A protein has these predicted regions:
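Canonical Rossmann dinucleotide-binding motif of NAD(H)/NADP(H)-dependent dehydrogenases/reductases
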Residues: 3-33
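Alpha-helical segment proximal to the catalytic Tyr-Lys
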Residues: 126, 180-181, 257
Length: 272
């Protein structure tokens, strides 16, 4: 297995794409620290990984908590004594046209999609540098992987998502910058921009509570899905969580050891 013995941290892995990512990495031998806002979904992912013969541990909590990054990284080090793969997947949308968008809506997207990954990566910097220096002194070249998640909205914009598009564009800038900073430590930092994937975010409109307990509308109009599948997506359908996870997995394999600072779209042919 290509990831045998690696330690992977995945945020937002209790359901949907995040769960598919965690299960894919575990199926290839990685030991996964599974994060979700709630203990239930995180535990369900861990149980599914265990049933499939993999190894994982749950770490519930909101990625927007100021100390989340430190605690998340500490859990990986305490449980598995390693840190090889980080996938910053957690997120959601809170759409509105700009004239109706509140400061709270705009800031919420920056908090979860930009500030949270920044804090996780900042917390990971000390152990990553420490491991890399020890490996260099021993004459070993060991690559680590960071995969940040952006969106086609961050690449080309999307009406009603000025907050989400701004945040996901920032993720790309963070990815490219960190690829330059961490190259000396043999860390590949790449980004996957998802198109329209069949998850609760593309289900018919409904309301859910976010990390702060606020009610937010999630999902899309059914007419949009029909238009996407018949007119906008060249491959003619939405993607599955498993197909989205495969894009992330590619950046976690040894085959990506000389690829860094790149953005790949997993969107069925949608390009900008």
């Amino acid at each position: 297995m290509k990831l045998d013995g690696k330690v992977a941290l995945v945020t937002g892995a209790g359901r949907g794409i995040g769960r598919a990512i965690a299960m894919k990495l575990a199926s290839e031998g990685a030991r996964v620290v599974v994060n979700d806002l709630d203990e239930g979904p995180a535990g369900e992912t861990v149980a599914a990984i265990g049933e499939a013969g993999g190894e994982a541990t749950a770490f519930a909590g909101s990625v927007t908590d100021p100390d989340f990054g430190e605690r998340f990284v500490a859990r990986a080090l305490e449980r598995y004594d390693g840190l090889d793969i980080i996938v910053n997947n957690a997120g959601y949308t809170w759409d509105n046209v700009i004239q109706k968008m509140t400061d709270e809506q705009f800031q919420a997207m920056l908090d979860v999609h930009v500030t949270a990954p920044f804090r996780i990566l900042r917390a990971a910097s000390e152990p990553i540098r420490r491991f890399a220096k020890a490996e260099a002194q021993a004459g070993r070249e060991v690559f680590r992987k960071v995969v940040n998640i952006s969106s086609v909205s961050g690449l080309g914009g999307n009406p009603g998502q000025v907050n989400y598009a701004a945040a996901k564009s920032a993720v790309i800038g963070m990815t490219k910058t960190l690829a330059k900073e961490w190259g000396r430590y043999k860390v590949n930092v790449n980004c996957v921009a998802f198109g329209f994937i069949r998850t609760r975010m593309t289900q018919p409109l409904t309301t859910e509570r976010d990390a702060s307990g606020r009610e937010v509308v999630v999902g899309v109009q059914p007419a949009l899905i029909e238009a996407l599948e018949t007119q906008m997506i060249p491959l003619g359908r939405l993607g599955t969580p498993e197909e989205a996870a495969n894009g992330v997995y590619l950046f976690c394999t040894p085959e990506s050891d000389y690829i860094s600072g790149q953005v790949v779209t997993v969107g069925g042919g949608i390009v900008f």
